[in-house]
């Protein structure tokens, strides 16, 4: 990976909450409060990332709200509505060898055990029982597929993930 990695998006700022600069936070982390384990945040305003710190946060029903340092009015909060929340990639914890961040799998080439190039991972869908790779097939797919959905079940369908080569080896029939 390059030394200048893209920030990792962990959530998004929603609408303002109250009149004292609080913001509703949409989080993409496993637990709702997990986004607050990271500091500082980067928020993207008008295409540029800038660093911010969370002054306070709390649960509001099933959601969370936060107050950022330097944001103390409703107008200042409203100006941040829909900004993405990210952290530098180097803040992400190292995972065990057999676990992967979704962001690292997106863009990987998917090849089956017979050598057929199934396409490229476009996104990953959380289904409850297991994650599913949404693979966009190559333009001239020999089986007439536009996309494939392959369950991310290691040792059953996922045989090997090589992040350095950006390839995922699967035991999957290309006609599915």
Swiss-Prot record:
Gene Ontology CC annotation, any one: ribosome
Name by which UniProt lists this protein: Ribosome maturation factor RimM
Family from the record: Belongs to the RimM family.
Keyword Transcription regulation: no
Compartments where found: Cytoplasm
GO biological process: ribosomal small subunit biogenesis; rRNA processing
Keywords: Chaperone, Cytoplasm, Ribosome biogenesis, rRNA processing
Source species: Shewanella pealeana (strain ATCC 700345 / ANG-SQ1)
One function term, GO molecular function aspect: ribosome binding
Principal place of residence: cytoplasm
Function, in words: An accessory protein needed during the final step in the assembly of 30S ribosomal subunit, possibly for assembly of the head region. Essential for efficient processing of 16S rRNA. May be needed both before and after RbfA during the maturation of 16S rRNA. It has affinity for free ribosomal 30S subunits but not for 70S ribosomes.
């Amino acid at each position: 990976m390059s030394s200048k990695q893209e920030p990792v998006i962990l959530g998004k700022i929603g609408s303002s909450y109250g009149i004292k600069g609080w913001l509703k936070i949409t989080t993409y982390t496993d637990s709702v409060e997990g986004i607050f384990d990271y500091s500082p945040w980067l928020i993207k305003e008008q295409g540029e990332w800038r660093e911010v710190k969370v002054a306070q946060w709390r649960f509001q029903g099933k959601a969370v709200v936060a107050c950022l340092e330097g944001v103390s009015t409703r107008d200042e909060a409203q100006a941040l509505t829909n900004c993405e929340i990210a952290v530098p990639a180097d803040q992400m914890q190292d995972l065990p060898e057999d676990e992967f961040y979704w962001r690292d799998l997106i863009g990987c080439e998917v090849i089956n055990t017979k050598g057929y190039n199934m396409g490229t991972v476009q996104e990953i869908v959380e289904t409850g029982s297991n994650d599913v790779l949404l693979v966009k097939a190559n333009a001239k797919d020999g089986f007439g597929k536009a996309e494939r959905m392959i369950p991310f079940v290691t040792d059953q369908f996922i045989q090997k993930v090589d992040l350095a080569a950006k390839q995922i080896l699967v035991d999957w029939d290309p006609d599915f």
